[in-house]
Amino acid sequence: LYAESINFIINDEEISSERAKVKFFIEQDSITHPAVTFKYAKSIKTLTLTRGDDGISAAPFYNSYHRLDMYPQSMIWKLGDPIINFEPLPLASDNRAQFASLNFFDQRIFDDLTGNTGNPLVKIKNFTIEYGGTEFPVTALANYFRKTVQDIQFLLFKLTEYGFINYDDDRKLVSCSEKLFNYIETVSYTHLTLPTRYR
């Protein structure tokens, strides 16, 4: 496990952060998230990672091993345990979690993102070709869109929430996920989404 944050609170009982970038290593693969609430309880050796409701914190956990975007409310892992539990928040009325393959295509999302000036996913893909990479400063993308960073920030949060990009607001960097390119190019692929309920 790797965790990174601008601010960790460390005391005798726990290690915590309101916003941490995390990476679970699974052999050559990983489960990652750009900005979860991080809490490690020392007494029970248990780590709880909680997604937020909006912006970067609402982004899915990306599972490169199973090639899934995962949308549980929280992930709970006891050190040394081979199992990671997905659980709802205490008192949560919604006990559903969603897992979507990287090739899953939702026409409603695509249409929702499409505006008078076209679809931002297509624009970002074209920008990566021109830029020569899939990670870049947010200022470069804003210039390509002919807007200010502030003008496109809401869009970046929204695309992060959908799992198309990771926007690191602290470092002002954008990295495109495989899902962005799949969404544009693989509409004819087999699409799979797995809604589930916590037990």
Spans of model-derived segments:
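Beta-strand-dominated lipid-handling architectures at cellular/organellar boundaries
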Residues: 1-62, 67-69, 74-88, 92-94, ...
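Secondary-structure transition motifs
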Residues: 91-120
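Short amphipathic alpha-helical interface segments
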Residues: 111-145
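Basic amphipathic alpha-helical segments that dock to polyanions
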Residues: 141, 155-162
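A short, conserved structural fragment
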Residues: 160-170
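Accessory beta->alpha helical hairpin/"wing" motif in late/C-terminal subdomains of nucleic-acid enzymes
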Residues: 169-188
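Single conserved hydrophobic/aromatic residue that forms the stacking wall/gate
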Residues: 191-198
